[in-house]
Regions:
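Feature captures the catalytic ectodomains and active-site-proximal regions of enzymes
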Residues: 1-180
Length: 180
């Protein structure tokens, strides 16, 4: 028996570079996310499955691209397994990697999720995901913790996922000025 999930025809989409003018790369261990990145016209960089290996890949290829999409699967897997402690541990591992990311001096750094996976539900859910946006041009807010409730009260408020890249491009000075 063969079970095909989300099987469809290959859509014709503009590449990431055509749409946003950026050379984009994806660092992802999980095949579905590599496939989505390829569909978006990103170069898929070979990497390992740990955050340390993904960070090493990022550092090694830092000068070659304008945009990096780094996918960490462990937080999602822990949520699907209903393992709250493992989810906390995975998130803390991402937290520990942030100083190394900031040391690369990105124009913009965004940390978020593609969906919420609460350990209590053991499944993807409708809940909003927190978003951390760091750039020299960001206005500081009063948020000191990273979580759904805290981030919703921050400077970005409730942001639709389709708006995130535009906000990132604005903070990177990559949008065409409009108005006076």
């Amino acid at each position: 028996m063969v079970l095909l999930r989300s099987f469809a025809r290959h859509p014709v989409l503009p590449t990431f570079r055509e749409r946003f003018g950026l050379r984009a790369a994806a660092i992802a261990a999980y095949p579905m996310y590599r496939g989505l990145a390829r569909l978006a016209g990103m170069e898929i960089l070979p990497t390992g499955t740990t955050i340390a290996e993904q960070l090493a890949t990022l550092k090694e290829r830092w000068a070659d691209f304008d945009f990096f999409y780094v996918h960490v699967k462990r937080t999602d897997t822990a949520g699907e397994d209903g393992d709250f402690a493992a989810k906390v541990k995975a998130i803390e591992e991402v937290d520990r990697a942030l100083p190394a990311l900031v040391s690369l001096r990105p124009d913009v750094l965004a940390v978020t999720g593609d969906h919420s996976t609460p350990a209590t539900l053991r499944a993807h859910s409708w809940h909003p995901v927190p978003v951390l946006l760091w750039a020299k041009t960001c206005r500081p807010d009063t948020v000191t913790t990273f979580g759904e409730r805290a981030c919703a009260a921050g400077g970005l408020g409730h942001l639709a996922g389709r708006e995130l890249l535009t906000v990132m491009l604005a903070h990177a000075g990559r949008l065409t000025k409009f108005g006076a």
